[in-house]
Amino acid sequence: GIACLCDSDGPSVRGNTLSGTYWLAGCPSGWHNCKSSGQLIGACCKQ
């Protein structure tokens, strides 16, 4: 999957660890959305 920035990673993409995974169809079962304000399409999810 594509790495994405969770809220817990910090405010900026630069120099931060991207601990989330981007899912176009939303988070799969057992995962949770880790970004409170994100894209209109898809979700940044963590296991």
Curated annotation (Swiss-Prot):
Annotated compartments: Secreted; Nematocyst
Coiled coil location: none
Cystine pairs: 4-44, 6-34, 27-45
GO molecular function: sodium channel regulator activity; toxin activity
Keywords, in A-Z order: Cardiotoxin, Disulfide bond, Ion channel impairing toxin, Nematocyst, Neurotoxin, Secreted, Toxin, Voltage-gated sodium channel impairing toxin
Domain of life: Eukaryota
InterPro entries: Anenome_toxin (IPR000693), Myo_ane_neurotoxin_sf (IPR023355)
Entries under Gene3D superfamilies matching the protein: Anthopleurin-A
Keyword Disulfide bond (UniProt): yes
Any single GO BP term: regulation of signal transduction
Any one GO CC term of the record: nematocyst
Short name of one Pfam family: Toxin_4
Family designation: Belongs to the sea anemone sodium channel inhibitory toxin family. Type I subfamily.
Purpose: Produces a positive inotropic effect in mammalian heart muscle. Modifies current passing through the fast sodium channel (Nav) in neuroblastoma cells, leading to delayed and incomplete inactivation. Paralyzes the shore crab (C.maenas) by tetanic contractions after intramuscular injection.
Protein name: Delta-actitoxin-Ael1b
Biological source species: Anthopleura elegantissima (Green aggregating anemone)
